[in-house]
Amino acid sequence: MFKSIQICILLVIEISFLGCSSTKLTFNLNKIENTRVLRNASFYLKEKPITVTSSFCERSAGTLHDFYSEGDYWWPDPAHPDGPYIRKDGMTNPDNFIVHREAMIRFSQISGALGSAYILTHDQKYADQLVLHLKAWFINEDTKMNPNLLYAQAIKGIATGRGIGIIDTIHLIEVAKAIQAIQNSNALSKSDLTTIKLWFSNYLNWLTTHEYGIAERDNGNNHSVCWALQVAAFADLTNDTVVMDFCRNFFKNTLLPNQMAKDGSFPLELKRTKPYGYSLFTIDAMASICQILSTKDDNLFLYSTKDGRNMALGLAFIAPYITNKSLWPYTKDVMYWDEWPVRQSSLLFGGLAWHTKKYTDLWQTLNADFTNPEVIRNMPVRYPLLWVIN
């Protein structure tokens, strides 16, 4: 994990970056997050676990314990109503089965809030409540989820599941982070912690060896980035240093040079029907990879390819359009244009890594408690205390 920020109430960093004169960045993340974290955690103290076993879709080829979702942009063919679905890029089919995805997002929101509240207060009631949900998802035989995504983003008449569906479990990342936050508390027994980590280890093995996982790794756009982000997070939780090393090299040698242009943009995302949202999503995911994998001796935020592609360039490209979206020179997103931006994690992680006040200041001005379901789905980093305090 990124070790440069230690547990404390006030983060004060003195630096000299890229030849600039030494400056001081004073950033009280605990104070910024305190009210919203404790408010949200208070609500989640009353919530009972809901896992994949709480509902089943008859179109699923899996069992009650298998996560199931359907491809977003696939619709009935008007010319062949009973035939295979057809694709409409960027247009979400509202009749798709999304109950398992909603349950996982809810689990992520609960975990993030409770884990963050425990960091702030060390009150075991937050850890105890989180453990109830962890046991339901990963331990209890009647309610746990199988550690694979064989039936994610299925398409009627075409596929019972696809590698592209792996992106659905980006919402387990802050679950993993929350586990790390409470793992030394009295709420989680050694036996339960071992079982939970074994679940993540099994899922990590599936992600890195199954044909769906390999396909997602090699997809080439934001899906490859999110595959690496998940793999890095789960390897960090399970202390799989071999996989973490692989992810560092994958970021340096594949993701950054293959997806970022020399101006810091992401051409593969700009070609999509939602170029603004996808660009934000991708820079956030890359910054999150850097936040997990950076070490004192290998800081991915400072890494640059030989031709100058790096995270600073990527954030410099998108930041002006976060500040003023009306300047966006590309096509407007076909859906959810008005809902973006929100509190993009790349601004925080990059701002702290480079000690750049304009980014942390901008981050603070943006909405942290967004409610649009599509925005929530595409913002897996919601509770930054889990990420920057060890």
Give a label for each model feature.
Residues 233-329:
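Long, repeat-rich segments with strong aromatic
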Residues 163, 167, 171, 192-199, ...:
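Short, contiguous, pocket-lining structural segments
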Residues 1-9:
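Bacterial N-terminal signal peptides that target proteins for export
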Residues 15-18, 242:
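Hydrophobic alpha-helical membrane context
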Residues 8-16:
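Bacterial N-terminal signal peptides
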Residues 20-214, 225, 294-297, 304-390:
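Extracellular glycan-targeting catalytic surfaces
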